């Protein structure tokens, strides 16, 4: 144990830079002879020096006959190799022509596909632009359809409703018109029908304990309806009245309505049923 050091120091490892990737040199094109040899299957490996036999035991004539035989065999082998090579070349040429035809057909197909895709892309862009224009036009049309053009009527006053003894009045805008609107006539007929139905129900039930607010509401609606018809007639006859005169007429109308309302409230509190029936008969007699 005494051989071991008493202290052990742990030091940080040195910073080792990452090895830079080596740039690969571009591959050189193979020479034509090597390409042809690969296609034909020739052996391009290195060949050693040819060893010659010692012919010391043969005579000169035997050497000549042997040489002639070897030349004849070599010529025949060369002819056979030439035929075999020519056959291989024909096969390779046939395969290359077929591959060239296939590549040309594939290239033409890819050209047509690329052209179709470009046309579809242009058509999609044009279609999107047309859709955006149509959408904008439809939005504009919807906006203009939602716009409502209203004509203001001179002296048109909202009905006065009494709830719990407090007045809640709403005043509508006033303007000049030349002739009465159809919806005003329909509204007047509907109001008369509603009032007659309410009175029939009241007569059938014979209920004398009806709230004062209901009487005052009905009276206010009737007064407003009659005054509106009068104002419509006067506005048709004199369409050139100024706005100041119209405002003064509205103020006077409001004052008369308030006075009439107070009077009606007193009368209704005294005897509700009889006074309301007289008032309704009076309005029915008026054309």
From Swiss-Prot:
One of its GO terms (molecular function) is DNA-binding transcription factor activity, RNA polymerase II-specific. One of its GO terms (biological process) is response to endoplasmic reticulum stress. Gene3D superfamilies: 1.20.5.170. Keywords: DNA-binding, Nucleus, Transcription, Transcription regulation, Ubl conjugation. Residues 63-88 are annotated as: Basic motif. It comes from the Eukaryota. Disruption phenotype: RNAi-mediated knockdown inhibits induction of expression of the endoplasmic reticulum chaperone BiP homolog hsp-4 and heat shock protein hsp-3 during the unfolded protein response (UPR). Larval development is normal, but in a pek-1 genetic background, causes arrested development at or prior to the L2 larval stage. Abolishes crt-1 promoter activity. Reduces lifespan, perhaps acting independently of macroautophagy. In combination with RNAi-mediated knockdown of atf-6, causes lethality early in larval development. Residues 89-117 are annotated as: Leucine-zipper. GO terms for cellular component: nucleus. Residues 78-87 have a biased composition (Basic and acidic residues). Its main location: nucleus. The keyword ATP-binding does not apply. Pfam families: bZIP_2. Residues 63-87 are annotated as: Disordered. Residues 61-117 form the bZIP domain. Required for transcriptional regulation of the unfolded protein response (UPR) in the endoplasmic reticulum (ER) under stressed conditions, acting downstream of ire-1, and also maintaining ER homeostasis via a negative feedback loop, in parallel with ER kinase pek-1. May also regulate Golgi protein trafficking distal to the ER. Protects the host organism from the detrimental effects of mounting an innate immune response to microbes, such as the Gram-negative bacterium P.aeruginosa, probably by modulating the UPR. This is X-box-binding protein 1. It comes from Caenorhabditis elegans. The gene is xbp-1.
């Amino acid at each position: 144990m005494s051989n071991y050091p008493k202290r052990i120091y742990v030091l940080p490892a040195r910073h080792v830079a990452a090895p830079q990737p080596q740039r690969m040199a571009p591959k050189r094109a193979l020479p034509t002879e090597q390409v042809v040899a690969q296609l034909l299957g020739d052996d391009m490996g290195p060949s050693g020096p040819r060893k010659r036999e010692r012919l010391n035991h043969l005579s000169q004539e035997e050497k000549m006959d042997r040489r002639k035989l070897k030349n004849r065999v070599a010529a025949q082998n060369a002819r056979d190799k030439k035929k075999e090579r020519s056959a291989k070349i024909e096969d390779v040429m046939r395969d290359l022509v077929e591959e060239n035809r296939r590549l040309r057909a594939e290239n033409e197909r890819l050209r047509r596909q690329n052209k179709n895709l470009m046309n579809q892309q242009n058509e999609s862009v044009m279609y999107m632009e047309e859709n955006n224009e149509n959408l904008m036009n439809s939005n504009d049309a919807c906006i203009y359809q939602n716009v409502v053009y209203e004509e203001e009527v001179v002296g048109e006053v909202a009905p006065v409703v009494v709830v719990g003894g407090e007045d809640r009045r709403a005043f509508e805008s006033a303007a000049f018109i030349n002739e009465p609107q159809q919806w005003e006539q329909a509204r007047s007929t509907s109001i008369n029908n509603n009032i007659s139905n309410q009175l029939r129900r009241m007569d059938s039930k014979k209920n004398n304990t009806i709230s004062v607010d209901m009487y005052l509401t009905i009276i206010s609606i009737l007064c407003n309806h009659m005054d509106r018809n009068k104002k419509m007639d006067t506005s048709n006859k004199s369409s050139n009245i100024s706005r100041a005169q119209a405002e003064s007429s509205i103020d006077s109308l409001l004052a008369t309505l308030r006075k009439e309302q107070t009077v009606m409230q007193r009368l209704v509190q005294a005897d509700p049923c009889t006074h309301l029936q007289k008032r309704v008969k009076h309005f029915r007699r008026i054309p």
